[in-house]
């Protein structure tokens, strides 16, 4: 069947759910689709569909591992929504998922209040540059005491402020995602309030349309008879059919031509900043491109191994290391969708870095990746985030 052309009528915004495991992120995503589908603004999807790629834990729960993309509309906008994994082990995916957000919906269970991963996700949202967080206080139907809800709300505001979000004025919507799925009026009303909140609170992103095209590769697959498709979110610029592009990072830079562009299984003649697209690349083998490389306008970005960076090392209370590290420390660095091992070299006269410190260091990666000044990254070790940083200068 011929694919429908994608209609651009409303402004397009990327959002996503973040928060602690079992606080209701995926249930909220399902409830938004359920409520909006009743108005003809979304296609309904079940919890199990959204949590696809999850590993089943018991009869009712799925640990959401895969980042799941869904789409829906409000009265004003078209949203692409990523359901981000909440489990601590999968923060790595959270880093690639949160990178796709113009704003985040932080889901907090009223019964539990903020938990360790709530904190970690807010920090990561700050590091990957999510500009605005709207809060959905979920499961309020389980709490009879309004004072308790006020306390939880206060705690959330303090936490947002701690990580440089506007906690004082943050929009906090109280509701029950399950009640919304079941079609209960108070459940649906909360989802409507949330839709209004994301419409007004999450700024329409200043798309970086005029900059040279760049997309970080998230996934690669081959389509029989057509060639290799690379998927990801266009970070900046515009790509059109038959544009020449470069594949940069992890191996020698190569050049190719874009022979197809699609979004949500519909064909486009161009993709622009903020779109999640698949690009069909001429003459590229499935093995010729991998996650973590970038596809970019020719000569617009180059691969580098060495840089200076300002880093913040999480304190023990924030879930970071308990002990200092020394010159020559070798963690993983997460850039866009790439994880690369590298070495941290401390400034002269500095013997060690303590948890809670922030400091300027030199980093050297084992593979060259597409890198530029002001780019953010996370520092990971043994499956958890221990710090975050920003490139201040490219060395070589």
Swiss-Prot record:
<dbReference type="InterPro" id="IPR041709">
    <property type="entry name" value="EF-Tu_GTP-bd"/>
</dbReference>
<feature type="binding site">
    <location>
        <position position="26"/>
    </location>
    <ligand>
        <name>Mg(2+)</name>
    </ligand>
</feature>
<dbReference type="InterPro" id="IPR000795">
    <property type="entry name" value="T_Tr_GTP-bd_dom"/>
</dbReference>
<dbReference type="Pfam" id="PF03144">
    <property type="entry name" value="GTP_EFTU_D2"/>
</dbReference>
<dbReference type="Pfam" id="PF03143">
    <property type="entry name" value="GTP_EFTU_D3"/>
</dbReference>
<keyword id="KW-0648">Protein biosynthesis</keyword>
<feature type="binding site">
    <location>
        <begin position="83"/>
        <end position="87"/>
    </location>
    <ligand>
        <name>GTP</name>
    </ligand>
</feature>
<keyword id="KW-0251">Elongation factor</keyword>
<comment type="subunit">
    <text>Monomer.</text>
</comment>
<dbReference type="InterPro" id="IPR033720">
    <property type="entry name" value="EFTU_2"/>
</dbReference>
<dbReference type="InterPro" id="IPR004160">
    <property type="entry name" value="Transl_elong_EFTu/EF1A_C"/>
</dbReference>
<dbReference type="GO" id="GO:0005829">
    <property type="term" value="C:cytosol"/>
</dbReference>
<dbReference type="GO" id="GO:0003924">
    <property type="term" value="F:GTPase activity"/>
</dbReference>
<feature type="region of interest" description="G1">
    <location>
        <begin position="19"/>
        <end position="26"/>
    </location>
</feature>
<dbReference type="GO" id="GO:0003746">
    <property type="term" value="F:translation elongation factor activity"/>
</dbReference>
<feature type="binding site">
    <location>
        <begin position="138"/>
        <end position="141"/>
    </location>
    <ligand>
        <name>GTP</name>
    </ligand>
</feature>
<keyword id="KW-0963">Cytoplasm</keyword>
<feature type="binding site">
    <location>
        <begin position="19"/>
        <end position="26"/>
    </location>
    <ligand>
        <name>GTP</name>
    </ligand>
</feature>
<keyword id="KW-0479">Metal-binding</keyword>
<dbReference type="InterPro" id="IPR027417">
    <property type="entry name" value="P-loop_NTPase"/>
</dbReference>
<dbReference type="InterPro" id="IPR009001">
    <property type="entry name" value="Transl_elong_EF1A/Init_IF2_C"/>
</dbReference>
<comment type="function">
    <text>GTP hydrolase that promotes the GTP-dependent binding of aminoacyl-tRNA to the A-site of ribosomes during protein biosynthesis.</text>
</comment>
<dbReference type="InterPro" id="IPR009000">
    <property type="entry name" value="Transl_B-barrel_sf"/>
</dbReference>
<dbReference type="InterPro" id="IPR005225">
    <property type="entry name" value="Small_GTP-bd"/>
</dbReference>
<feature type="domain" description="tr-type G">
    <location>
        <begin position="10"/>
        <end position="206"/>
    </location>
</feature>
<dbReference type="Pfam" id="PF00009">
    <property type="entry name" value="GTP_EFTU"/>
</dbReference>
<comment type="similarity">
    <text>Belongs to the TRAFAC class translation factor GTPase superfamily. Classic translation factor GTPase family. EF-Tu/EF-1A subfamily.</text>
</comment>
<dbReference type="GO" id="GO:0005525">
    <property type="term" value="F:GTP binding"/>
</dbReference>
<feature type="region of interest" description="G3">
    <location>
        <begin position="83"/>
        <end position="86"/>
    </location>
</feature>
<feature type="region of interest" description="G5">
    <location>
        <begin position="176"/>
        <end position="178"/>
    </location>
</feature>
<keyword id="KW-0342">GTP-binding</keyword>
<dbReference type="InterPro" id="IPR050055">
    <property type="entry name" value="EF-Tu_GTPase"/>
</dbReference>
<feature type="region of interest" description="G2">
    <location>
        <begin position="60"/>
        <end position="64"/>
    </location>
</feature>
<dbReference type="InterPro" id="IPR004161">
    <property type="entry name" value="EFTu-like_2"/>
</dbReference>
<dbReference type="InterPro" id="IPR004541">
    <property type="entry name" value="Transl_elong_EFTu/EF1A_bac/org"/>
</dbReference>
<keyword id="KW-0547">Nucleotide-binding</keyword>
<keyword id="KW-0378">Hydrolase</keyword>
<keyword id="KW-0460">Magnesium</keyword>
<feature type="region of interest" description="G4">
    <location>
        <begin position="138"/>
        <end position="141"/>
    </location>
</feature>
<protein>
    <recommendedName>
        <fullName>Elongation factor Tu</fullName>
        <ecNumber>3.6.5.3</ecNumber>
    </recommendedName>
</protein>
């Amino acid at each position: 069947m011929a694919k429908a052309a994608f209609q651009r009528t409303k402004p397009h915004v990327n959002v996503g759910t973040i928060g602690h495991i079992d606080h209701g992120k995926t249930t909220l995503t399902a409830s938004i689709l359920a409520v909006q589908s009743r108005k003809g603004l979304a296609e309904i999807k079940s919890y199990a569909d959204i949590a696809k790629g999850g590993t089943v834990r018991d009869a009712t729960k799925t640990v959401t591992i895969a980042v799941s993309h869904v789409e829906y509309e409000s009265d004003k906008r078209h949203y692409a929504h990523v359901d981000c994994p909440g489990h601590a082990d999968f923060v790595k995916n959270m880093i690639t998922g949160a990178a796709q957000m113009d704003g985040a919906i932080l889901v907090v269970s009223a019964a539990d209040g903020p938990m360790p991963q709530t904190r970690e996700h807010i920090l990561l949202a700050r590091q990957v540059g999510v500009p605005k967080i709207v809060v959905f206080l979920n499961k309020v139907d389980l709490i009879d005491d309004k004072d308790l809800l006020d306390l939880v709300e206060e705690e959330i505001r303090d936490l947002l402020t701690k990580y440089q979000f506007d906690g004082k004025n943050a929009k906090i919507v109280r509701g029950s995602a399950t009640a919304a799925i079941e079609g209960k009026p108070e459940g649906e009303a909360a989802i409507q309030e949330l839709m209004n909140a994301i419409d007004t609170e999450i700024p329409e992103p200043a798309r970086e349309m005029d900059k040279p095209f760049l997309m970080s590769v998230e996934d690669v697959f081959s389509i029989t008879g057509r060639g290799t498709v690379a998927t990801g979110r266009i970070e900046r610029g515009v790509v059109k059919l038959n544009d020449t592009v470069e594949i940069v990072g992890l191996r020698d830079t190569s050049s190719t031509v874009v022979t197809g562009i699609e979004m949500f299984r519909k064909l486009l003649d161009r993709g622009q900043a903020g779109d999640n697209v698949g690009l069909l690349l001429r003459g590229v083998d499935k093995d010729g491109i991998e996650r973590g490389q970038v596809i970019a306008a020719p000569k617009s970005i180059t691969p580098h191994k060495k840089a200076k960076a300002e880093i913040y090392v999480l304190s023990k209370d924030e879930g970071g290391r308990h002990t200092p590290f020394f010159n020559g420390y070798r963690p993983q660095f997460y850039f866009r969708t790439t994880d690369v091992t590298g070495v941290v070299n401390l400034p002269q006269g500095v013997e060690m870095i303590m948890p809670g410190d922030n400091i300027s260091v030199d980093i050297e990666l084992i593979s060259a990746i597409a890198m530029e000044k002001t780019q953010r990254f996370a520092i990971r070790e043994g499956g958890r985030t221990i710090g975050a940083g920003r490139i201040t200068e490219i060395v070589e």
